[in-house]
Amino acid sequence: FFQLAVFVVILFNINLLSASAGSKGSSAPQSSGDSVVAEFCDTNCTMKKDGKWTECNGDCFCVHVGNETVGRCMRLDGDYDYTSSKTTRRNKKTRNGLCRLDRNRTTVDYPERNTREP
């Protein structure tokens, strides 16, 4: 009887863990005190031969992916100032990669994707 009880408890835990790990449905809405809206500007930015990036106009900053030499200018509007001189670098995880926010540019690094079908 003891072995059967342990087996049932193990099966219950496995079922509970697999159900919670596999749930990709919508969750309850979460509220954040910091609201940010990202908008692309009308201009692009490019990496110069010296490795520096061309400046974007106004409140816009340069965003590029990985080692690309061409990027887009982007603006963040909201309650939180990502381009503040007080914070020269912040890391923020995005859904598909790591987004590094600097004063002058933002880099999005995407991890290698698994191309095999599940």
Swiss-Prot record:
- Sites where a glycan is attached: 44, 67, 104
Q: Which residues form the signal peptide?
A: 1-19
Gene Ontology cellular component terms for the protein in this record: extracellular region
> So which domain of life are we looking at?
Eukaryota
Keywords per UniProt: Disulfide bond, Glycoprotein, Secreted, Signal
Q: List the disulfide bonds.
A: 41-60, 45-62, 56-73
Q: Which GO terms describe its molecular function?
A: C-X-C chemokine binding
Localization terms from the record: Secreted
Q: What does this protein do?
A: Salivary chemokine-binding protein which binds to host chemokines CXCL1, CXCL2, CXCL3, CXCL4, CXCL5, CXCL6, CXCL10, CXCL11 and CXCL13.
Q: What is this protein called?
A: Evasin P1080
